[in-house]
Amino acid sequence: ENKDDFIPDNLSGFYAVSFDPKGKLGWKSNKIIDEDPGYGDAQIIEVLTEQVDGRYLAYLQSMEIPYIFAGEKEIDVKIALEKLKTLMGINSILLEGGSIVNGYFERAGVIDEISLVVAPIVADAEDKPLFMDSTLSEFKLKEIKQYDDVVWMNYIRK
């Protein structure tokens, strides 16, 4: 079944794109409600695969959350980026995914810059890769800065 993208009329122009292949996220609003600077009131956009149940699509429509389809069973990043550009006017994104989403983008070859922050914090969490199932991509150091006890490194694709 070919499913149609859903783009409501009342879009904000400030977006948070969620890659949700199976349609599992239960949003309470169509905007991000977060006290962290830079995220509050961002319009949520769901990127889905065609395997998502019609009931979830009805839920997103009732919440006026835009969604686009990008792949049958797995997210096709290039389709997603093209649709975000043509349907929403989004030309570049800040990727803040976990290792799975980061891996989608890395394997698609669409990451042109990596910004890493090293902070002196010890966490009690299991080790997780930055990119799941990645290919070998090479980047070169563009810039490095120290902010108090934190180091920021900016890399660009070779």
Segment roles from a protein language model:
Residues 1-158:
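Enzymes that bind and transform nitrogen-containing heteroaromatic metabolites
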